[in-house]
UniProtKB/Swiss-Prot annotation:
Physiological role: Involved in iron-sulfur (Fe-S) cluster assembly. May act as a regulator of Fe-S biogenesis.
SUPFAM superfamilies: Frataxin/Nqo15-like
NCBIfam families, per the entry: FeS_CyaY (TIGR03421)
GO BP: any one term: iron-sulfur cluster assembly
Name this protein carries in UniProt: Iron-sulfur cluster assembly protein CyaY
Molecular function GO terms recorded: ferric iron binding; ferrous iron binding
Family: Belongs to the frataxin family.
Amino acid sequence: MNIAEFHQNIEQVWQKIEEELENQGADVDCETQGSVFTITFDNRTQIVINKQEPLLELWIASKLGGFHFAFKNGDWVSNDGQRFWDCFVEACAAHGENVQF
């Protein structure tokens, strides 16, 4: 994957998150600043998702900790094989919002 494809893939992830959270009625605010996408929950906790361009990775930080994902076979996957979307759903639940992706 080249840099342009990387950014396009990340933008698609961020757009899907924002659209699905809105469609599912989640009480959150989403904000993008440069390479950082922040989701603030009603209880004022946050999930931060950011682009790591030099590594071509997607990173997520939440109450559950920090996780790194690389794009493999059409999906964002961590070194231990966890899918980004599964991690994101678990993180949202830890922050008080039950969502499905």
